[in-house]
Each structure stands twice: as structure tokens, then as C-alpha cells.
């Protein structure tokens, strides 16, 4: 009997340590999570789901429990999950215009939207979901810098290269805004031509 108790305890502890490796979703209200994000200096991450969303369930079962997800999200975010069809999830869905599931909201501690990711972010275990998140963050920062007016050649090269991978629609807009003012001669210079030839 004592042996069975020890084995049960070891299995329980092993299960807990595995569970703690993944993303720690806290049972907090939206306002409590914002307050905690502010006091910890982190941003808020919301997994927006519905009960009938298959990809949402897949992410919860196979991706968020991964150690690398836990290491990244637990360090940088206060993480919560909200059903967008009940409770305060309804108001969150309206406020942040959530219409596709899953949607992942990254919120500043003042409640403003930092950025969001939609269903295209669903990963297979062999994919790197954390890297996808980092890519979207980098793109959001580049978008902000472009909107602020940065048209430096080195920045534009980095921005356009990123858009080629992340957002083809926005790429066309940016090329339309930045290339014509250069004129044909400058546009044909190797460093500029390399931006648009792909």
C-alpha cells in the first residue's frame, strides 16, 4: 500500500512539472489580468476561442503545453483564455473586433491593442509557434515605424523584405507609396531594384 502511495505521488508530481512547462493560463477576469500585466510590466495575451472551434482545442492540447511556448509566454505575458461567445468574452470580442477563431490578442496594460494573430497562426507541433509570434511582433514594430514616417533606405529594405514574407497586400501598398517618388534612375539602382524584383 505504501509503495502504491509513493508511485501515485511521483506520478502526480511528474504530471504537475510537465503541466508547468507549458503556457500558464491564469483564471483572471480581463480587468484583473490588465492590472496584473501593469504591475508586472508584461503585456496581456488572450487566447480567444469558442467551444466549437477545433483549431482552438488543438492549440490548447498540443501547442500551448510545449516547453518553448511556456518559456516564452510565461516570461513576457499574463495569459488568459476567454470564450468569445459567453461571459466577458462577448465584450472582448466586440471591443477588439474578434470574428475568426482562434484569435490571439496581445494587449498593452492600458487595454490598447498591441497586435493580433488569427487562425493562420495555428501550428503543428513541429512548427515553431513562438517564432511565428515573434515574426508578427517584429512586423507590428516595423509597421509602426513606417507609419511614423521612416523612409530610410536600410529600414525600407528590412520592411519590404519582411512584408514579402508576412503581408503581400500591404507590400503592394508600400511599394506603391515608396517606389514612384524615387524616379526611374534611382529605382534601377541595384539596392532598390532588389527590393521590387521578387
Where are these regions (language model features)?
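Detector for the c-type heme attachment site
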Residues: 57-61
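Oxidative protein folding and maturation machinery
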Residues: 148-198
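Bacterial Sec-dependent N-terminal signal peptides
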Residues: 1-23
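N-terminal leader/targeting and pre-domain segments
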Residues: 20-40
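Thiol-based oxidoreductase modules, predominantly thioredoxin-like and allied folds used
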Residues: 22-28, 48-50, 62-89, 98, ...
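Short active-site neighborhood of thiol/selenol oxidoreductases, capturing the structured segment around
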Residues: 40-53
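Non-catalytic, surface beta->alpha helical segment in thiol-disulfide oxidoreductase systems
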Residues: 99-143
Amino acid at each position: 500500500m505504501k509503495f502504491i502511495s509513493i508511485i501515485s505521488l511521483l506520478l502526480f508530481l511528474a504530471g504537475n512539472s510537465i503541466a508547468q512547462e507549458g503556457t500558464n493560463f491564469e483564471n483572471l477576469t480581463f480587468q484583473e489580468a490588465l492590472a496584473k500585466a501593469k504591475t508586472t510590466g508584461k503585456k496581456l495575451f488572450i487566447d480567444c476561442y469558442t467551444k466549437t472551434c477545433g483549431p482552438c482545442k488543438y492549440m490548447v492540447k498540443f501547442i500551448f503545453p510545449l516547453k518553448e511556448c511556456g518559456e516564452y509566454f510565461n516570461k513576457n505575458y499574463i495569459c488568459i483564455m476567454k470564450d468569445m461567445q459567453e461571459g466577458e468574452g462577448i465584450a472582448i470580442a466586440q471591443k477588439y473586433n474578434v470574428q475568426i477563431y482562434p484569435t490571439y490578442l496581445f494587449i498593452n496594460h492600458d487595454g490598447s491593442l498591441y497586435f493580433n494573430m488569427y487562425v493562420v497562426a495555428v501550428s503543428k507541433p513541429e512548427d515553431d509557434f513562438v517564432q511565428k509570434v515573434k515574426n508578427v511582433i517584429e512586423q507590428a514594430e516595423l509597421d509602426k515605424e513606417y507609419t511614423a514616417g521612416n523612409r530610410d533606405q536600410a529600414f525600407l529594405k528590412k520592411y519590404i523584405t519582411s512584408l514579402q514574407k508576412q503581408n503581400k497586400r500591404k507590400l503592394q501598398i508600400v511599394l506603391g507609396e515608396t517606389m514612384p517618388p524615387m524616379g526611374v534612375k534611382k529605382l534601377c539602382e541595384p539596392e532598390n531594384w532588389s527590393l521590387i524584383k521578387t
